[in-house]
């Protein structure tokens, strides 16, 4: 009998422990207030995968902080609003995130949430799960129901009528046009046969919050298997196959490129590592692959590598006389979150065998860029 009692007590203790753990999944303060939040995402644009995926909110999470302490957290799947989050009246900090995947947010302090980072992934390249954040927001909750993003009429405390804006952490860089118009010196002699589009010197890691998301992590990613050792080449550099695409002629409706993270290369001195979008392929002479003395001469001119392949790199959002920008936009020498960098490339001569070296102002390339919000940047490049 005693054994049976102890056994039953043990089961009860285990059950209580399990219940406690379930309750901790989303800590809620039983207070005198609730808050409901409606979200506004940036406009959708055609992606490399499914267009709507760029703005898809697969999971929306709202957190309420009392100082550093997480007072409440609630999530909704495939929704742009989270309602009736139980909390307490008073000054609070609101944190909103979307598409956080398996990221563990329950119980994190405000400082810990602000310090969160993300890494560039293969899944991002099909616009899947583009993480979004809004900067932490100070609000004052009143006893009863509180609302953000709802009509200002009706019951409760309407903190703001406009939906809360949330932005993608990623940016998009893409060719929307590549055309070959050889100048008189090369016309009817040289042609370019494109084979690949590469993303080069892409930041591996990004912060999720802050005026800039660029952090001190020194790791970069490339789609090319070639080691260039150029002036821009970072020391910590890894190849990933998903920053490489087989060439398909880009159009405005079917851009060709990659999603990337913030990168700042605006320093006036010292080493910079600019993010590059690059088209790669064969340089041909009189319709044939380069061989013999023609290949040797092109190599000596730093036009091609040993296989007669050439690169046409475009430094994204970069200030250069070879680049023009739409709508009077001033290039910032950086990749910024939630920006879409659309690039039109005109090739007027041979390229380079080292896309991670500075290009000369007389390079055979013209670039035209557009930026929008998504902030669109239109960039035009001529090689």
Curated annotation (Swiss-Prot):
Q: Quote the subcellular location field of this record.
A: Fimbrium; Cell outer membrane
Q: Which residues form the propeptide?
A: 19-46
Where are the annotated segments for Important for oligomerization and fimbrium assembly?
374-383
Q: How does it get modified post-translation? A: Synthesized as palmitoylated lipoprotein precursor. Efficient export to the outer membrane and integration into fimbriae requires lipidation and subsequent proteolytic removal of the lipidated propeptide.
Lipid-bearing positions (S-diacylglycerol cysteine): 19
Q: Which GO terms describe its biological process?
A: cell adhesion
GO molecular function terms listed in the Swiss-Prot or TrEMBL record: structural molecule activity
Q: Where is the signal peptide?
A: 1-18
* Predominant localisation class: other
Q: Which InterPro entries match?
A: FimA_C, FimA_N, Fimbrillin
Covalent lipid sites (N-palmitoyl cysteine): 19
| Record-linked PROSITE patterns | PROKAR_LIPOPROTEIN
Entry keywords, A to Z? Cell adhesion, Cell outer membrane, Fimbrium, Lipoprotein, Membrane, Palmitate, Signal, Virulence
- Site positions (Cleavage): 46-47
Pull one GO CC term from this UniProt entry. pilus
Concerning its family, UniProt says:
Belongs to the bacteroidetes fimbrillin superfamily. FimA/Mfa1 family.
What is the protein's known function? Structural subunit of the major fimbriae. These long, filamentous pili are attached to the cell surface; they mediate biofilm formation, adhesion onto host cells and onto other bacteria that are part of the oral microbiome. They play an important role in the invasion of periodontal tissues. Fimbriae and their constituents are major virulence factors. FimA proteins from different strains have highly divergent sequences, and this has been used for classification. The sequence-based classification correlates with pathogenicity.
Q: What else is known?
A: The name (major fimbrium subunit) does not indicate the abundance of the protein, but is derived from the greater length of the major fimbriae. In strain ATCC 33277 and strain ATCC BAA-1703 / FDC 381, major fimbriae are 300 - 1600 nM in length and about 5 nm in diameter. In contrast, minor fimbriae are only about 80 - 120 nm long. This length difference is observed only in a small number of strains, including strain ATCC 33277 and strain ATCC BAA-1703 / FDC 381, and is due to a loss of function mutation in FimB, a protein that restricts fimbrial length in other strains.
Q: How does it assemble?
A: Fimbriae are composed of a major, structural subunit (FimA) and the minor components FimC, FimD and FimE. Head-to-tail oligomerization of FimA molecules mediates assembly of the fimbrium stalk, while the minor components probably form the fimbrium tip. Linear, head-to-tail oligomerization of FimA is mediated by a conformation change, facilitating the insertion of a C-terminal beta-strand into a groove in the N-terminal domain of the following subunit.
This chain belongs to the protein called Major fimbrium subunit FimA type Ib
| Biological classification of the source | Bacteria, Pseudomonadati, Bacteroidota, Bacteroidia, Bacteroidales
